[in-house]
Each structure stands twice: as structure tokens, then as C-alpha cells.
Amino acid sequence: MKVLENVNVALKANVYFDGKVTSRAIYVGGQKQTIGVVLPGEYEFSTTQPEQMQVTSGSFEVLLPGESQWQTFAEGSTFNLDADVSFSIRATDVAEYLCSYL
């Protein structure tokens, strides 16, 4: 299990899609990241700045901007997103992620 040390955690969760996706802001060395949980379902998100998403548990499919085919990302894999784009996530089981803002 990977552990993030010396982390500050926001106490209030970000809750999306009627609680089916939740995340918390964390601060590592002053850099904001979010850790989150995705319950089964399909969800569309938008970015405001470049992001790197790392799947930390389970897996989910992602429809990246400009793509027509879903791609599966399993635990330990990452994908990058530009600012001001939309993308979709489809999960069949519970999955977790770490989002780093680039």
C-alpha cells in the first residue's frame, strides 16, 4: 500500500453524482491533489487545469477527449488531461484515484 506522508487533508468532501463519486483535497508539500472514490456508474467530468489521474485501486474505463473508444485503466496506471476538456469515466466496481494538478 502506498502511503502519502506529511499530508494536510480538507475535512469536507467533494460530493458528485448523488454521492456516487466523492473526493477530498489533500496538500502534499503545498501542492493540491485530490483522492477519490468512484462507485459503479458512468460519469462526465470537466477540467479547469491540466491533470494527471492515477488509478489507486480497482479499475475503470475512460473516454478521453476527442476519442471514440473507451480505454481501461487499472490500478497503478495513469492518464493525463489538458485544461478545459471533458472526459467520461465508467466503473463496474468501486475504484479509487489520485488526481494531481499539473
UniProtKB/Swiss-Prot annotation:
- This protein's GO CC annotations: cytosol
Quote one Gene Ontology molecular function term: uridine phosphorylase activity
Glycosyltransferase: present as a keyword of the record? yes
Pfam families recorded: Ppnp
Q: What is its EC number?
A: 2.4.2.1, 2.4.2.2
Its recorded reaction(s) are:
a purine D-ribonucleoside + phosphate = a purine nucleobase + alpha-D-ribose 1-phosphate; adenosine + phosphate = alpha-D-ribose 1-phosphate + adenine; cytidine + phosphate = cytosine + alpha-D-ribose 1-phosphate; guanosine + phosphate = alpha-D-ribose 1-phosphate + guanine
Keywords of the record, alphabetical order, are: Glycosyltransferase, Transferase
Q: Which InterPro entries match?
A: Ppnp, RmlC-like_jellyroll, RmlC_Cupin_sf
Function, please?
Answer: Catalyzes the phosphorolysis of diverse nucleosides, yielding D-ribose 1-phosphate and the respective free bases. Can use uridine, adenosine, guanosine, cytidine, thymidine, inosine and xanthosine as substrates. Also catalyzes the reverse reactions.
Q: Which family does it belong to?
A: Belongs to the nucleoside phosphorylase PpnP family.
Specify the protein name: Pyrimidine/purine nucleoside phosphorylase
